[in-house]
């Protein structure tokens, strides 16, 4: 398998011809390379302007134009562009690749998978095409098929450490969503071993994508919708923590957390939300009897909707897995509580009648922010460290190491060890992290 060609740098406008020549050469070796390059550079306005001005007679320019429209989700324009630039001779199967990516964006997963299978069989050494194939399986819920394809991909010789790591990211997700948590954990441990062979990552800059106003809009929208159907949704977890500690939504919260009491129906809430054009079921979320994840198209915010259930003298909360997988669930127990009506920033919400006690059960000493808190396995009221919980902590650990957040990674290792995970890779990773934490300082 050929090594990955070096990517050209972002050009100034006069350099666009030379850039397109380089990308054309790359496309002849691997039609996925120019598309992967575009994904990394499409936020550059100079580049986009230069590509728009490029001649449509240059095949790679037409391909990039089509793919940029797909990435932008301008699917009507993308469909027209793909047909306009379709070439009768297509030895590299670029037309088929674009068609597959287009149908994947349209969520026509059956047609997309048929097309991408054809292309990946023609270009077995293309990391980009394998990634798109495996991502499609994740989005479509084709987990068993995705695992088969992952095994084929990872077995190929010639992948470098970075490429293997990228494939493993997708493979571990496929196994986890197929409830094969032990295998997902094993892959994550392999990823940690690979990370230690790579140069240390610089701490990632804080994302500027978070928008408090849009997140607030998303919260009030989902609460008003469900209340309009007689339910009593209320902020929970990080969203309640922001309300009670900061008086505002936390600026580092990645999603909204909304809960229902046992008397309300999560199934009905799902139907109500999905009947709205505004919401879609979030892809790549674990199938659970007590948890659903939605994407708000208007605000671009993710909404986690969870349901409490009766657990004897307590109330259960978390990710309750279906059927034979229930023993692997992530379960938290809360003392029973009632809901009260209260005001937050001029809006009325339901909330637990004793938020202090609720948050203490979930976070321990919650009044002082702890940037390294393990919100998955570090919560005081977690009932058991199941394989699903362990797999989730490993997901977070790999992510923290990748982003250079070594202090949080150390805290996650401590959490795993507190739950009797003494795998050797954790010891090696701890030494590696300590060394690189000193270098960061």
Residue ranges and their predicted role:
Residues 22, 65, 99, 133, ...:
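Structural register within alpha-helical repeat arrays
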Residues 69, 103, 137, 174-175, ...:
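Residue at a conserved register position within TPR or TPR-like alpha-solenoid repeats
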Residues 55-56, 89-91, 123-124, 158, ...:
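Short coil turns that delineate tetratricopeptide repeat
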Residues 208-223, 227, 273-352, 357-361, ...:
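Conserved catalytic core of two-metal-ion nucleotidyltransferases
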Residues 139, 147, 160-165, 169, ...:
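Helical scaffold of the NTase/Pol beta-like nucleotidyltransferase catalytic core
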Residues 223-256, 263:
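Active-site nucleotide-donor binding segment shared across nucleotidyl transfer reactions
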């Amino acid at each position: 398998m050929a090594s990955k060609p070096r990517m050209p740098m972002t050009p100034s406008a006069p350099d666009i011809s030379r850039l397109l020549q380089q990308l054309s050469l790359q496309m002849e070796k691997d039609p996925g390379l120019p598309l992967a390059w575009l994904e990394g550079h499409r936020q550059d306005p100079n580049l986009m302007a230069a590509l728009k001005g490029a001649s449509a007679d240059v095949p790679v320019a037409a391909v990039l134009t089509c793919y940029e429209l797909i990435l932008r989700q301008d699917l009507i324009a993308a469909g027209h562009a793909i047909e306009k630039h379709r070439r009768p001779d297509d030895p590299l199967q670029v037309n088929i690749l674009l068609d597959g990516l287009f149908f994947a964006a349209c969520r026509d997963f059956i047609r997309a998978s048929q097309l991408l299978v054809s292309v990946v069989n023609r270009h077995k050494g293309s990391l980009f095409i394998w990634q798109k194939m495996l991502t499609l399986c994740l989005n479509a819920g084709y987990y068993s098929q995705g695992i088969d394809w992952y095994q084929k991909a990872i077995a190929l010789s010639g992948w470098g450490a970075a490429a293997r790591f990228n494939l493993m990211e997708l493979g571990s997700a496929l196994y986890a969503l197929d409830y094969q948590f032990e295998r997902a954990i094993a892959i994550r441990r392999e990823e940690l071993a690979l990370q230690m062979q790579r140069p240390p990552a610089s701490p990632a800059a804080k994302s500027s994508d978070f928008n408090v106003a849009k997140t607030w809009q998303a919260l009030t929208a989902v609460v008003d919708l469900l209340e309009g159907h007689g339910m009593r949704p209320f902020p929970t977890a990080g969203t309640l923590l922001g309300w009670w500690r900061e008086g505002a939504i936390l600026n580092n919260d990645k999603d909204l957390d909304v809960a229902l009491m046992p008397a309300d129906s999560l199934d009905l809430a799902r139907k109500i939300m999905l009947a709205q054009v505004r919401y879609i079921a979030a892809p790549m979320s674990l199938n659970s009897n007590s948890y659903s994840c939605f994407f708000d198209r208007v605000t671009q915010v993710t909404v986690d909707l969870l349901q409490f259930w009766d657990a004897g003298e307590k109330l259960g909360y978390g990710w309750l897995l279906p059927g034979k997988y229930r023993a692997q669930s992530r379960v938290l127990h809360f003392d029973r509580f009632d809901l009260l009506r209260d005001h937050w920033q001029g809006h009325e919400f339901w909330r637990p009648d004793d938020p202090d006690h609720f948050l203490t059960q979930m976070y321990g000493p919650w009044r002082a922010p702890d940037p390294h808190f393990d919100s998955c396995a570090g919560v005081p009221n977690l009932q058991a460290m199941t394989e699903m919980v362990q797999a989730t902590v490993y997901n977070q650990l790999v992510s923290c190491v990748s982003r250079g957040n070594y202090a949080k990674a150390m805290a996650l290792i401590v959490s795993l060890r507190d739950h009797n995970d003494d795998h050797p890779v954790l010891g090696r990773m701890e030494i590696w992290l300590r060394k690189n934490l000193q270098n960061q300082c």
